[in-house]
């Protein structure tokens, strides 16, 4: 019996690099930053979000600043 062909996963493209003028990463933009936080309150990994290394670093810094300013929670409220 023949094996099924192995598919490579589709490469994710950094949304910030793709559309440069659309959005900048700012700690006050909580709706954007919530997309990069898991339901447990952790910052999602690069391989999950598809961001490039520079923009992933910027997102992480913005999330940490927003947490410090009490705009985002450190942990989730779900139990």
Swiss-Prot record:
Query: Does the keyword field hold Plastid?
Result: no
Q: Name one GO molecular function term.
A: small ribosomal subunit rRNA binding
Task: Write out the transmembrane intervals.
Answer: none
Question: Which UniProt keywords are listed?
Answer: Ribonucleoprotein, Ribosomal protein, RNA-binding, rRNA-binding
Specify the superkingdom: Bacteria
A GO-annotated cellular component: cytosolic small ribosomal subunit
For whether the record's keyword set contains Hydrolase, the answer is: no
Name the Gene Ontology biological process terms.
Answer: translation
InterPro entries recorded: Ribosomal_bS18 (IPR001648), Ribosomal_bS18_CS (IPR018275), Ribosomal_bS18_sf (IPR036870)
Q: Family per UniProt?
A: Belongs to the bacterial ribosomal protein bS18 family.
Functional description taken from the UniProt entry: Binds as a heterodimer with protein bS6 to the central domain of the 16S rRNA, where it helps stabilize the platform of the 30S subunit.
Quaternary structure (record): Part of the 30S ribosomal subunit. Forms a tight heterodimer with protein bS6.
Q: What is this protein called?
A: Small ribosomal subunit protein bS18B
Q: Which organism does this record belong to?
A: Saccharopolyspora erythraea (strain ATCC 11635 / DSM 40517 / JCM 4748 / NBRC 13426 / NCIMB 8594 / NRRL 2338)
What lineage is on file? Bacteria, Bacillati, Actinomycetota, Actinomycetes, Pseudonocardiales
